[in-house]
């Protein structure tokens, strides 16, 4: 089992000056950020481009703007886009939902979720769907460690997405417990997660063992994410991000 250990500092929220077309709400500064994902170069051919727009809101709640991990996870989805049509995909801790929105645009059947305790984050999920003309994408409240009627009613998933959900160490076990419950519906489901390393003292190894899970690290260079400016953005910058695939220990990838 691979150990997951952070190695880099916390990333600050985006600079307000970097947001496009800012608009004001009571106590909030909002804008739109555009990401362009391009196909690999083909000799003599055109490169298809997929555009995703997401809202950005400067707010104390973390999920209201794009973090470096989200762009890396979205790039992994884009690299594997041909495997996504028809797949059932759930994004947890979605916030502005860049990975989930991209998956939906690539043909996956996507459900976006965020904490039911933060209605503004759920509103941001819905706004992302509206901006990308995805009325079919469902948004549900899902709080770490809580078995609610929403989580009970979720259908089996093929892929669970989570970008930078391992942010507060005190939440790590609640996150894995929630993922474990979701995996019970489909033991072959995979949890695709990006993780910004922040402290050498943090590790998921013990919790993964406790919950009978295993973790594989995916090299960033294997899906063209080993750069500072993915999807024509300024992210992930110089932050150290790891791509993880977590599954039940008894199942092989």
Curated annotation (Swiss-Prot):
<keyword id="KW-0489">Methyltransferase</keyword>
<keyword id="KW-0217">Developmental protein</keyword>
<dbReference type="InterPro" id="IPR019410">
    <property type="entry name" value="Methyltransf_16"/>
</dbReference>
<keyword id="KW-0963">Cytoplasm</keyword>
<dbReference type="GO" id="GO:0035642">
    <property type="term" value="F:histone H3R17 methyltransferase activity"/>
</dbReference>
<protein>
    <recommendedName>
        <fullName>Histone-arginine methyltransferase METTL23</fullName>
        <ecNumber>2.1.1.319</ecNumber>
    </recommendedName>
</protein>
<keyword id="KW-0539">Nucleus</keyword>
<dbReference type="GO" id="GO:0050890">
    <property type="term" value="P:cognition"/>
</dbReference>
<dbReference type="InterPro" id="IPR029063">
    <property type="entry name" value="SAM-dependent_MTases_sf"/>
</dbReference>
<dbReference type="GO" id="GO:0044727">
    <property type="term" value="P:epigenetic programing of male pronucleus"/>
</dbReference>
<keyword id="KW-0949">S-adenosyl-L-methionine</keyword>
<dbReference type="GO" id="GO:0035242">
    <property type="term" value="F:protein-arginine omega-N asymmetric methyltransferase activity"/>
</dbReference>
<dbReference type="GO" id="GO:0044725">
    <property type="term" value="P:epigenetic programming in the zygotic pronuclei"/>
</dbReference>
<dbReference type="GO" id="GO:0005737">
    <property type="term" value="C:cytoplasm"/>
</dbReference>
<feature type="region of interest" description="Disordered">
    <location>
        <begin position="1"/>
        <end position="23"/>
    </location>
</feature>
<dbReference type="Pfam" id="PF10294">
    <property type="entry name" value="Methyltransf_16"/>
</dbReference>
<comment type="subunit">
    <text>Interacts with HSPA5, HSP90B1, TUBULIN, UGGT1 and UGGT2. Interacts with TET3. Interacts with STPG4.</text>
</comment>
<keyword id="KW-0808">Transferase</keyword>
<dbReference type="GO" id="GO:0031072">
    <property type="term" value="F:heat shock protein binding"/>
</dbReference>
<dbReference type="GO" id="GO:0032259">
    <property type="term" value="P:methylation"/>
</dbReference>
<comment type="similarity">
    <text>Belongs to the methyltransferase superfamily. METTL23 family.</text>
</comment>
<dbReference type="GO" id="GO:0005654">
    <property type="term" value="C:nucleoplasm"/>
</dbReference>
<dbReference type="GO" id="GO:0045944">
    <property type="term" value="P:positive regulation of transcription by RNA polymerase II"/>
</dbReference>
<dbReference type="GO" id="GO:0140297">
    <property type="term" value="F:DNA-binding transcription factor binding"/>
</dbReference>
<dbReference type="GO" id="GO:0001940">
    <property type="term" value="C:male pronucleus"/>
</dbReference>
<keyword id="KW-0156">Chromatin regulator</keyword>
<dbReference type="GO" id="GO:0001939">
    <property type="term" value="C:female pronucleus"/>
</dbReference>
<comment type="function">
    <text>Histone methyltransferase that dimethylates histone H3 at 'Arg-17', forming asymmetric dimethylarginine (H3R17me2a), leading to activate transcription via chromatin remodeling. Maternal factor involved in epigenetic chromatin reprogramming of the paternal genome in the zygote: mediates H3R17me2a, promoting histone H3.3 incorporation in the male pronucleus, leading to TET3 recruitment and subsequent DNA demethylation.</text>
</comment>
<dbReference type="GO" id="GO:0042054">
    <property type="term" value="F:histone methyltransferase activity"/>
</dbReference>
<dbReference type="GO" id="GO:0032991">
    <property type="term" value="C:protein-containing complex"/>
</dbReference>
